[in-house]
Amino acid sequence: MEPLAANGELENWDALRARKSFPDLLLGNGASLAVWRNFAYFSLFDEAQTTRNRPLSPTELSVFRAMDTNIFEQALGALRNSIRVNAALTINASSPRHRYFAIKEALIHAIRSVHIPWSQMPADTLASINQELSRYRTVYNGNYDLLTYWAELHAPGGFDNIFRGSDATFEPTYTARKGNTTRILYLHGGLHLVKNADGSTRLLNSSESTLLASFAINQLGDIPLFVNESSSEDKLKSIRGSDYLSYCLGQLAQPTEGLCIFGHSLSKQDHHLLHAVQQASPKALAISIYPHNSNFIEQQKSYYQQLFAEHPHIELCFFNSMSHPLGNPGLRVPVPKSDLGATH
C-alpha cells in the first residue's frame, strides 16, 4: 500500500477506472441509501420491535435471547426444528408454531416499513443500476434488500444465474461461469432467497412486484435466507450453516486484480468480510467516500488505512462516491412524507 496523506481530496471515479482495473465490486448499505433514504435504519431487529403492525412481543423476544442472537433466520430455524421434533415425538405443543408465525409476521411488517415499494421504483433507475452492475465480473452484495435483484431482473441477459438446480435451488457443484457474464453473489442472503428444510437455498419464483410478500406468513417450510444486523460472529453462524452463503464468502476471498468497495464501511460487525477482502489480496482497492467535508474525508481515509495497515501491498484509492454511477444523485427516489418515520 503506497503511503497516502490523509487529506480531504478524492478522485473522480471515471478517472480512477481509466487508469486501474477493478473487475469486482463490493456493495454496502450506502448503495441502497443512494436510492431510498429509509434504508438508513440501524437494525431490522429493532424495527421489528417498534413497527406499528404486529411488533415482536416479549415472548417472541425471549426466543432471540435464549439463542443469543438478533438474526431472524437462526430464530426461525430453531423454532421450525422444534416443531418437527415435537411432531416426530407426537408432543402436542402449539407454542413453537405460534411463535414461529408471530416472528415471521413481525419480520415481514418490519421489512415493508423500511423497504421501497415496487410501485415507487422508477424503471430508469433500475436501468441505470443494471447498466453499471453489468460492467463488473462479480458483484458481492452485502445488502439483503431487493434493489440489486430488481435491477438484475430489469435486463437479466448479461447476468449469470447460479440457481440452476431443480426448483431454482443452489447446487454447489454446478457453479461454472457461463460466458462473459456478471455474477451477483449475496453475501448475507436476500429477501428473494429462502432456506429449504434440508438447508439448501432456493431462489423465490416470484415477479418483481410480489417479492416483498413472497415468504408468506402461513408457510412453515420457507425461512427467509438473509442475515440481518448482528455481530460478525453471529453472522458467521448463519453463513456457515448455508452452502450458498459459505460459497459467496469463499468467492470474496479469492484473488482479484482490483476490487471497488462502494458504500461499505467494513465495520467490526462485518469483520468476516474484511478478512475475506484481505485474504483476496487485490492489487488495488477503490473505496468510495461521500464528500461531506474535508474533515470527514480525512477521517474516512485514515479509518480504511488502519484496516489495511498490515497489508502494505494493497494500494488504496479513494474516490468521490457521487462521481460513481451508483452514487449519482439522480438515482434518489423521494420518500413520501407518509413513509417518513412510519415504523413508530
Task: Please give the residue ranges for each predicted region.
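Gly/serine-rich nucleotide phosphate-binding loop at the start of the catalytic core
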Residues: 1-137, 145
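Alpha/beta-hydrolase fold catalytic core
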Residues: 223-258, 267-268
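A Trp-anchored, charged/polar loop motif used as the substrate-binding/catalytic surface
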Residues: 5-11, 118-125, 167-173, 236-250
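Short, flexible loop segments at boundaries between secondary-structure elements
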Residues: 54-60, 169-185, 283-303
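SIR2/sirtuin-family catalytic core signature
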Residues: 1-25, 31-35, 247-344
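Short secondary-structure boundary/capping segments
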Residues: 38-46, 153-159, 302-304
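Residues immediately flanking
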Residues: 28-29, 144, 189, 264
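Extended, H/D-rich, highly charged conserved domains that either
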Residues: 23, 61-92, 125-240
